[in-house]
Amino acid sequence: MMNWEYMTILEDNMEKKNTAVVTVVGNDTVGIIARVSAVLAQHEANILDISQTVLSGMFNMIMIVDISLSAFAQLSDSLTALGNEMGLQIRIQRSEIFDAMHRI
């Protein structure tokens, strides 16, 4: 008989292997969410959660995306190129890496 707590942790870890965290920071301009979303859609990444705010003209956004159908390296390159084009810092990290880096 399996421990339910263990099963929950295992399922969470399995889900995280297919998710990534996208962060966007830069001067607020029209169309940031639309353009980032378009790149994600082109790479078949599904947005699971999104939070954005603008503080003193600075745009900040974090997205959780399902990358099960995406080629991670190509998606990362496309987001970096979009960031360079728009003057934004756009980063994508696999969820398990993001969690490990931000664990206290």
Predicted regions and their residues:
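A conserved regulatory-domain signal marking ACT and ACT-like small-molecule sensing domains
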Residues: M2-I104
